Amino acid sequence: MILTTADTLGKREIIEYKGLVTGIIVRTPTITQGILGGLKNIIGGKNTSYTNVCKEARLHAEQEMINQAQELGANAIVAIRYDSSSLGGTTSGTEVFCYGTAVVIR
C-alpha cells in the first residue's frame, strides 16, 4: 500500500478512485504513563509517556484507514491528512483521526 499526503503519485497513474477512507482511535495513557507524564509536566522536558501514546494512536488510526482501502481493492491512498484532539475531563485521552482517498494506481 502506497501512502502519500500529495494529491498525485508523480509518474504513477491513478486509474480508479475508490473513495474516502478513514481511521479513528481514542487512546488514554495507562496509570503509569499518566503519573510519569504528570511528573514530567511539573519538572519540564520531553514527555515521552504522552508522546508514545500519541504515536501509537496515530499508527492504529492509519492501519484502520489502510484496512478500509484494502477492502475497497485500492493499492494506494492519496491526499492523506491527520488531525488530533485532546479529550479532557475524566478520560484525558487523545483522539487521532486520519483520512485520505483510496485509489488504484498502475
Swiss-Prot record:
InterPro entries: UPF0145_dom_sf, UPF0145_YbjQ-like. It comes from the Bacteria. Pfam families: YbjQ_1. Belongs to the UPF0145 family. PANTHER family: UPF0145 PROTEIN SCO3412, UPF0145 PROTEIN YBJQ. This is UPF0145 protein Fphi_1781. It comes from Francisella philomiragia subsp. philomiragia (strain ATCC 25017 / CCUG 19701 / FSC 153 / O#319-036).
